[in-house]
């Protein structure tokens, strides 16, 4: 173990999210320590290892060396989506705990394999959804579960970004990405709605389209989708790779409504506002390093030998739901969501 009170990590994948968010978070975490970094670019790995205090750096071909490092207790997987399962299972087979970026994998079958291998080697598996720890989202969850909004009826959520010219090519490669805007940003709408409702959807509908056929030959640019939950709750969701960056989440109940804006971006002031019984409320939440909270929560789960939240099953469910949305778009009909 890296230190008596800190879990040692190897960060696998040094793309944008790692460089701007995950690596800086290790500097401030009291429970997780960066030991090594792994990248396809050894010069970049060396530069970022030196910048952020990792003692060692490796290429993907040297991944086994990172897994054999005596101070590495866990891996944070932030590679392209299509390689999540491979790197996660190799880590688990080396008895390393796994924190994996969303989406968990490109298929339900890969997700199930990840869960089974982690279980067989008695290692923890967590999916990197920050909403479970971010204070504004937690406050909204508490408001919903308190019953003050009454019985939930409708949720609206969207996450849109405008991919700039020169964006990494893997975003447009179905084999590497698994999909387009739905799996990259729409997944937040899917996961957060399930978390708030406290139930899983039973039916999915979807519609996908693109305004740039030359740029989006393999994956979708825009998605509009609907999830039907038990007891009549419905989520209307949307995601885009071709709209200005924004995100929101609106929750409507019989007694009131609440909204979170922005809902999913990090390092921004969040507003939680709404109306209950004719009375307006609003609270602002200053930016907080959600990645530190995520790292600390996973490290604590490892130390206490308990299943983290959100675990691998939550990631699998989101992948299954998104596959149902895609199937609905292909077949132009609602698709039952089967999560048994």
What do these predicted regions represent?
Residues 1-3, 74-76, 300-340:
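C-terminal helix-rich "cap/oligomerization" subdomain common to oxidoreductases
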Residues 113-131, 150-155:
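Rossmann-fold dehydrogenase core element
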Residues 18, 100, 125-127, 237, ...:
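Hydrophobic residues in well-ordered beta-strands that form the structural core
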Residues 131-216, 332:
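Predominantly a Rossmann-like dinucleotide-binding segment in NAD(P)-dependent oxidoreductases
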